[in-house]
């Protein structure tokens, strides 16, 4: 990190715990992304609601919330938890400009609230993805005492590319967050961002009315 900072590069690590956030601040990070386990891809153990305020209280650099955010409600909630901003992933995978395979986008749009699964916990590399023939087979494989870590890792090698590039429904790892069930359509990035910002602004402006 020192080399990057000396070069004038802003370093904003993704963290899944208070301890790691503090460590990153000590190392000179410009900000941290507090990512809850609702996120797609590699995840930690704490959810966003619990993680973000604890990290906000523990560090003196900006905190960006991530995990389970796909609309203005999530943005407003994150700001109320103390975050300076948000990082979104799943909702932008279905943006018109995103170059992933259409099968990937369509699977996210079709997903329900319970359609994700976390695999890789056994070997310390938990990943959240959509439930597919591949992810179910991976989960079953890692639960077997007769299968080694090397065999499991070999089974999963290249699976993200098979999803994102090839659109392989059976062999691809379609990483996505639990918020996938809230993503209902493929839209331009501009529309996604503007709708999130507008909804968040309305909610925050009207928040005091909920206390009356």
Residue ranges and their predicted role:
Residues 50-64, 70-212:
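Conserved active-site-proximal phosphate/metal-binding subdomains
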